[in-house]
Amino acid sequence: IDAICTHHEPLSSSAKMAPFAETQPGITAFDTYVALGVQLIQESLFEPLEWVEKVTSIPAQVANMTERWKQEAGWVLVDPELEWVVSKETILSQGKNTPLLGQTLKGKAVQTFI
């Protein structure tokens, strides 16, 4: 795996409330992205720094956005021990559709600095 990214395109609930073939594709991933990364690290599939590179600098290289990424990069403070339940209330994204609803995840971005 060279790079890991999401295609964050928030969809309202109404965009998903039709027969499957008629809905817009996609699931909510923005809110669970860090927790799933923490899980990959805890399962020893990635070292922490390796995962950070795969979700930050390497996607910027692939998209030919390295200079912009360096200029506009911020910091994210992650609590890898924070346990939380995925629910419509804890998902901040407009879209609330995820197969992870009701599951307890470990790890969450708790602060961003730009």
Model region roles, listed by residue range:
Residues 3, 9-80:
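His/Asp/Glu-enriched, well-ordered alpha-helical/loop segment
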Residues 19, 73-114:
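C-terminal cap of metal-dependent C-N hydrolases
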